[in-house]
């Protein structure tokens, strides 16, 4: 297989795009670097497409490697033919390849292998040939009676076992049946327990294999795993056996009757159970792939939430018996103070808690409260909103997801960062910092622990981790990282920076003071020329005398950027002050094509340079809608059908989205209630962090369920 041509076809790309991209990947370049700084070579492929192409490249190379192994194995058995070799070369998937190799694979003990060991292969061959004029099978079988094969029936049964395995091993037959089951099969589930709980809807359930939704596949799988459901695929057996008869029945002889019996046995005992397993595995793989994609998109939106900058913030980690942990964080994330208050039951020390928080607010000029969304959140919200009204000094609050905060606070990393604080106070610090800069704080946590997906614990963990790591890497490099303030964890997500290099950067910073230029990176231990090439453009040095060091312009393009300023009669001082009207006017006047030729760079690179010079130090997150901040609190009992509310999308899943509307319980907007037009998936319209207008459909206080709609009931 020509892998380059295959990728061109699958991704609808030009030959030069694929060839250049493969070379860049093989040369050890990172995806963020290729996406950002090699646009001319790739035709401006984005990082998501590059990751998909890279994953597919790995699969196809593994496929070719497997082909070589199978060819070697069959050749060693001296069974290779031109036809088999051609079939192997034409195989497009691992499944096709396994079907071809099945007859040659070393087998464990089977009924067919036992029959072969008894010398019944020639009898099976004679029966399978179904030649006219051949003696009846019963007569042929008499020649094979021995001490181990006591009678004709035993001989014929052994022959049928051999034929059954031959039919099962036929790649063409399996391909046809697999297609038929995929097209006409039905997934069924039945209750295996009186108490089905959340699986009640699957008690007597069926849905076509070809159309079953991924989230239902995963739900059924989980129900089966928990012993609540019995799951299988229903399929009309006659469709399959007719296909097999057409392939294996040659003449209408007495031997044909035995071949038909062998086919029937082969399908029921060998083929269908195997294909049923394969198809269910394929459905699960597709469902997991889709779920991982949703998880990745949700994680991306969570990481890319706009930071609430420039405010001293109090982080509140709510609790009942152990109290509410308090941490005061400066505008730059430094811990100023900590404590514990007890405004919730069983203590109810509300007045004492108000005095403590009021004192902290006045002492540090606090402007924001960040409240964790765990135990006792509602009581803490009520307490905070009452205090905000009493203080009347412009404070607002936001409930922050504390998913993963406990994992982080108990980690070795948190202990190194805050050795003086106990685990609970570290959580309060993390909650406050999540409001100030979600990306910088959340990179410290395993993205699987952030909890914005569905069935994440049922996913193949290796694939989930790889996908989420890619998402985190893409987000970090999209935003850029301040070289002088970033934690080792944030630095370690920058393209080309390993965890060891990240620690060395921090050590260099501590030993020599703040970086004053990007070029100083070259002095960091283990950060060689390749690593510098990959990471430099994503690291910012706001303190540098060179304005380009605080942009995403790569050092390799500095000469071109400076020449651009010269051509446009613009100074670095103009760029620092935001006086960019002349730059934009000159670029428009000369034209990007002519200007790119004059500077000897590609147009995409020129466009990126102009964009960066127009907004040095820009944060792409600042262009997104700001988080929804609150000053008052509601309870579920305050909600009424038809009530209009503003909310924040917290999670997007296959069947809808969960929206935080300011009560302790998130409400569900079912996919059918998102818009009046047809959508394939909620993510077509919504993403995590979106601020949306919703209307209450129904509230069930006992079950803690809130149904919402985004369709205006008044229209």
Specify the residue positions occupied by each region the protein language model found.
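Generic start-of-chain signal for non-secretory N-termini
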Residues: 1-19, 26
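Single-stranded RNA-binding regions, centering on S1/OB-family and related RNA-binding modules
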Residues: 544-545, 549-715
């Amino acid at each position: 297989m020509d892998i380059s041509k295959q990728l061109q076809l699958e991704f609808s790309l030009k030959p030069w795009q694929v060839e250049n991209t493969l070379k860049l990947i093989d040369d050890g370049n990172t995806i963020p670097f290729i996406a950002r700084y090699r646009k001319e070579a790739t035709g401006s492929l984005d990082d998501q497409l590059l990751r998909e192409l890279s994953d597919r490249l790995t699969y196809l190379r593994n496929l070719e490697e497997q082909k070589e192994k199978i060819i070697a194995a069959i050749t060693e058995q001296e069974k290779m033919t031109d036809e088999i070799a051609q079939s192997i070369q034409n195989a497009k998937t691992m499944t096709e390849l396994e079907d071809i190799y099945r007859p040659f694979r070393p087998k464990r003990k089977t009924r067919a292998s036992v029959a072969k060991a008894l010398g019944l292969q020639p009898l099976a061959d004679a029966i399978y040939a179904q030649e006219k004029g051949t003696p009846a099978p019963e007569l042929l079988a008499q020649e094979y009676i021995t001490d181990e094969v006591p009678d004709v029936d035993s001989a014929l049964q052994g022959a049928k076992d051999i034929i059954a395995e031959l039919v099962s091993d036929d790649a063409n037959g399996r391909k046809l049946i697999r297609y038929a089951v995929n097209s006409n099969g039905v997934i069924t589930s039945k209750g295996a327990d009186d108490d089905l709980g959340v699986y009640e809807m699957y008690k007597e359930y069926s849905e076509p294999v070809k159309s079953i939704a991924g989230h239902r596949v995963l739900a059924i799988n989980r129900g089966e795993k928990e012993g609540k459901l019995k799951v299988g695929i229903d399929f009309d057996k006659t469709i399959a056996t007719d296909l097999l008869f057409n392939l294996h029945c040659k003449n209408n002889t007495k031997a044909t009757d035995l071949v038909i019996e062998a086919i029937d046995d082969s399908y029921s005992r060998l083929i269908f159970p195997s294909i049923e397993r394969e198809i269910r595995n394929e459905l699960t793989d597709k469902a997991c792939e889709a779920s991982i994609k949703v998880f990745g998109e949700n994680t991306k939106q969570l990481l890319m939430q706009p930071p609430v900058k420039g405010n001293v913030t109090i982080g509140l980690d709510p609790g009942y018996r152990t109290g509410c942990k308090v941490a005061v964080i400066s505008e730059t994330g430094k811990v100023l103070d900590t404590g514990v208050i007890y405004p919730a039951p069983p203590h109810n020390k509300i007045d004492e808690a108000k005095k403590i928080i009021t004192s902290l607010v006045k002492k540090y000029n606090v402007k924001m409260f960040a409240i964790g969304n765990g135990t006792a959140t509602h009581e803490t919200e009520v307490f905070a909103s009452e205090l905000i009204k009493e203080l009347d000094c412009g404070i607002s609050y936001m409930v922050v997801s504390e998913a993963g905060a406990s994992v982080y606070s108990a980690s070795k990393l948190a202990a190194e960062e805050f050795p003086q604080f106990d685990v609970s106070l570290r959580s309060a610090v993390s909650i406050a910092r999540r409001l100030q800069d979600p990306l910088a704080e959340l990179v410290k946590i395993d993205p699987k622990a952030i909890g914005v997906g569905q069935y994440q614990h049922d996913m193949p963990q290796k694939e989930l981790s790889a996908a989420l790591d890619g998402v985190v890497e893409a987000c970090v490099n999209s935003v850029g990282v301040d070289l002088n303030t970033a934690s080792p964890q944030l630095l370690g997500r920058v393209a080309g920076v390993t965890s060891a290099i990240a620690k060395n950067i921090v050590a260099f910073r501590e030993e020599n003071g703040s970086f004053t230029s990007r070029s100083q990176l070259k002095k960091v231990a283990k950060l060689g020329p390749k690593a510098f090439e990959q990471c430099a453009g994503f690291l910012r040095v706001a303190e540098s005398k060179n304005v380009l060091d605080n942009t995403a312009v790569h050092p390799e393009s500095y000469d071109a950027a400076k020449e651009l300023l010269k051509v446009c009669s613009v100074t670095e001082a103009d760029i620092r002050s935001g006086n960019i009207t002349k730059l934009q006017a000159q670029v428009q006047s000369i034209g990007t094509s002519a200007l790119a030729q004059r500077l000897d760079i590609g147009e995409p690179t020129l466009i990126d340079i102009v964009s960066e010079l127009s907004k040095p130090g820009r944060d792409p997150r600042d262009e997104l809608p700001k988080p929804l901040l609150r000053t008052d609190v509601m309870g579920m009992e305050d909600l009424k059908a038809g009530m209009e509310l503003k909310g924040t999308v917290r999670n997007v899943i296959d069947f809808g989205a969960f929206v935080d509307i300011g009560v302790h319980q998130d409400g569900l907007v079912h996919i059918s209630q998102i818009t009046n037009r047809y959508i394939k998936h909620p993510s077509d319209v919504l993403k995590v962090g979106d601020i949306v207008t919703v209307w209450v459909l129904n509230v069930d206080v006992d079950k803690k369920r809130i149904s919402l709609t985004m369709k205006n009931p008044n229209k």
